[in-house]
């Protein structure tokens, strides 16, 4: 459960906070820079890319204008390269928890008289912004957890959904459960430090890169690690601290017991609206209803773009999200600079911008 952010935590002041660093969020950052807006990005994941990076990095994408075809991860890499000249701060492992209006008299220096928003995250960060652009895809991602009732008490100690510190597994018997790239990558990596690593998957086939699967099978054949086909059946503990000692595995032939002190379950991610669902926004089936002239939500200064935005005839396409973000930021500009008119200038005719983009 996230801890409360102290009211005295430092506050970062910027024009726009972008929630979500997937393709739409990254393009939004680029557009913010083009418009002359300062922005910062937050994402609950530990790196940029959203679903494209975490769920299907090798999925081919064919419907991006002027890009006949590319892999999902390649698209993310290109978007990162595109917005790099603006060098916007990105804060990973941060989930937006709450948003509150800052009364005009209490607004930060330089913005007195204009209502702004204070966004807090579960990681202790606070942002004073003119606008929030939510590009969180289908919502915040969370790991798919082990469904066994005894797993909850072991989470963070002996049951893990990510590898934060490899040294924690040194000299221990480790089971890595899952059949995707992350599961195989970490099983191969941990075999170098653990006493023994067993990869556990419900079937012989994998949802991973062919080269990674081949490397895993070679490591198993040469006795560097083990592979078991089966599913988690029970977690057994021992000792005063109730540490994990064995894992019961259901197999085709019945069951078997594997010694284990650590379990790394990498079953993929599931999406959930998260705290944004409590932000007093008009929502439809977990998505944010927006005005299609500005992509602003029912709450002033909060915008949505990408899969999380809802409106009639909405198309869940990355290119649609690009369009939505571009229009949202033009309205956000007026909140950031209410005294200034936004004059449209083609990037090719803006000498300063052209210099930044071509000589970054």
Curated annotation (Swiss-Prot):
Cytoplasm recorded as keyword: no
Residues binding FAD, per UniProt: 43, 51, 56, 96, 141, 307, 348
Enzyme Commission designation: 1.18.1.2
Species annotation: Cupriavidus taiwanensis (strain DSM 17343 / BCRC 17206 / CCUG 44338 / CIP 107171 / LMG 19424 / R1)
SUPFAM superfamilies per UniProt: FAD/NAD(P)-binding domain (SSF51905)
Keywords associated with the record: FAD, Flavoprotein, NADP, Oxidoreductase
Textual note on the cofactor: Binds 1 FAD per subunit.
GO function terms (MF aspect): ferredoxin-NADP+ reductase activity; flavin adenine dinucleotide binding; NADP binding
Cofactor: FAD
Top-rank taxon: Bacteria
Pfam families tied to this protein: Pyr_redox_2
Quaternary organization: Homodimer.
Family membership noted in the UniProt record: Belongs to the ferredoxin--NADP reductase type 2 family.
Catalytic EC class: oxidoreductase
Catalysed conversion reaction: 2 reduced [2Fe-2S]-[ferredoxin] + NADP(+) + H(+) = 2 oxidized [2Fe-2S]-[ferredoxin] + NADPH
Name of the protein in its database record: Ferredoxin--NADP reductase 1
């Amino acid at each position: 459960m996230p801890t409360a952010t102290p009211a005295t935590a430092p506050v970062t002041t910027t024009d726009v906070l972008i929630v979500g660093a997937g393709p739409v969020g990254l393009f939004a950052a680029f557009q913010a820079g083009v418009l002359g807006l300062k922005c910062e990005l937050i994402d609950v994941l530990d790196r940029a890319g959203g679903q494209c990076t975490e769920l299907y990095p090798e999925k081919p994408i064919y419907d991006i204008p002027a890009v006949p075809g590319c892999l999902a991860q390649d698209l993310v890499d290109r978007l990162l390269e595109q917005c790099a000249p603006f060098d916007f701060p990105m804060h990973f492992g941060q989930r937006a928890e709450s948003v509150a209006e800052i009364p005009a008299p209490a607004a930060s220096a330089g913005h007195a008289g204009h209502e702004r928003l204070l966004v807090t995250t579960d990681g202790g960060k606070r942002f004073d912004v003119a606008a929030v652009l939510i590009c969180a895809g289908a919502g915040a991602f969370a790991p798919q957890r082990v469904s066994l009732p005894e797993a909850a008490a072991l989470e963070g100690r002996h049951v893990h959904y990510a590898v934060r510190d490899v040294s924690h597994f040194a000299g221990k018997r480790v089971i890595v459960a899952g059949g995707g790239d992350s599961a195989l990558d970490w099983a191969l990596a941990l075999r170098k430090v653990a006493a023994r690593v067993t990869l556990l998957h419900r079937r012989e086939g994998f949802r991973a890169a062919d080269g990674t699967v081949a490397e895993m099978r070679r490591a198993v054949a040469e006795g560097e690690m083990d592979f078991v086909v089966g599913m988690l059946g029970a977690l057994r503990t021992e000792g005063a601290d109730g540490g994990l000692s064995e894992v019961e595995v259901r197999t085709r032939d019945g069951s078997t017991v594997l010694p284990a002190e650590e379990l790394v379950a990498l079953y993929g991610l599931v999406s959930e609206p998260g705290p944004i669902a409590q932000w007093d926004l008009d929502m439809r089936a977990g998505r944010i209803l927006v005005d299609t002239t500005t992509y602003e939500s029912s709450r002033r200064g909060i915008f949505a773009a990408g899969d999380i935005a809802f409106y009639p005839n909405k198309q869940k396409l990355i290119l649609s999200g690009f369009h939505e973000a571009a229009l949202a930021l033009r309205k956000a500009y007026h909140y950031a600079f209410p005294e200034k008119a936004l004059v449209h200038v083609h990037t090719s005719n803006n000498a300063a911008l052209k210099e930044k983009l071509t000589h970054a």
